Structure formats: structure tokens, C-alpha cells
From Swiss-Prot:
May play a specialized role in spermatogenesis. Its main location: secreted. It is found in: Secreted. This is Cystatin-12. Pfam families: Cystatin (PF00031). The lineage of its organism: Eukaryota, Metazoa, Chordata, Craniata, Vertebrata. Residues 1-21 form the signal peptide. InterPro entries: Cystatin_dom, Cystatin_sf, Cystatin_spermatogenesis. Keywords: Disulfide bond, Glycoprotein, Protease inhibitor, Secreted, Signal, Thiol protease inhibitor. GO terms for molecular function: cysteine-type endopeptidase inhibitor activity. GO terms for cellular component: extracellular region. Disulfide bonds join C82-C92, C105-C125. It comes from the Eukaryota. It comes from Mus musculus (Mouse). Located at the very proximal caput epididymis (at protein level). Expressed in epididymis, Sertoli cells and testis. Also found to be weakly expressed in ovary and prostate.
Length: 128
């Protein structure tokens, strides 16, 4: 009988552990997610050797880890004609022709938007 109790507790713990790390689809317009996207684009530009700024094009996936404010941000960005320190990059035209570049990035970001704190836990970008 004791082994059944131990097995039941183990299954409950494993079930809770498994559920707590799943990412679930969310509305890409959710406020904390949208702020996280802005931070990701800023972070990408700050850490690029390229003198040109990249701007947000579209969200491919918007996910949040269950019971947390950790977001998986999967987005596309395009290289603009503006420098990365210019104002109003959102309205800057994209480069065309030989200078045209687009990237797809996936970031995992922990967000505490109420204190303007963002922690990038993981990131991967590939040129498309």
C-alpha cells in the first residue's frame, strides 16, 4: 500500500513539473508581450556589428511559459536605410537590392514590465 502512495506522489510531482515548463500560445497584442518585442528589437540592434538598424516586420509565434512572464518571441526583422542610433526606425524604409537583409529570431525573454526589467535567457537568429 505504501508503494502506491509513493507512486501517486511521484506522478503528481512529475505532472506538475511537466506542466510548469510548457509554452502556450497567447495574443501577440498582449501588453507585456508587445513590450518584450520592442526590447528584443532594441537588444538585437545594440548587439549587431552592422551600422544599419533592423526594424520589426512581423511576429511569427507568440508564446508565454505557463504560470510565468517568460515569453518566446519568434519574429522577423528587416534591415533599414537608417543607422541603428537614428530616431524613428519604425518609419525608416527597408533596404532593397544588394543591401537587403532579413533575419528571423527566436528569443526567450523574462519580463518584469512594471519595473522595466527584461532578461534575455536565450536567443537565436538566422538570416532569411
Amino acid at each position: 500500500m505504501l508503494w502506491k502512495s509513493v507512486l501517486s506522489v511521484a506522478l503528481i510531482v512529475l505532472g506538475i513539473h511537466d506542466c510548469s515548463f510548457k509554452f502556450l500560445e497567447i495574443d501577440k497584442n498582449e501588453e507585456e508581450f508587445a513590450i518584450s518585442v520592442e526590447h528584443v528589437v532594441f537588444h538585437f540592434n545594440e548587439n549587431q556589428d552592422d551600422d544599419f538598424a533592423y526594424k520589426f516586420l512581423r511576429v511569427r509565434r507568440s508564446l508565454r511559459q505557463k504560470y510565468t512572464l517568460k515569453y518566446l518571441v519568434d519574429l522577423e526583422m528587416g534591415r533599414t536605410l537608417c543607422g541603428k542610433y537614428d530616431e524613428d526606425i519604425d518609419n525608416c524604409p527597408l533596404q532593397e537590392g544588394p543591401g537587403e537583409r532579413k533575419v528571423r529570431c527566436t528569443y526567450i525573454v523574462e519580463t518584469e514590465a512594471w519595473v522595466t526589467k527584461f532578461t534575455i535567457l536565450n536567443s537565436t537568429c538566422v538570416q532569411t
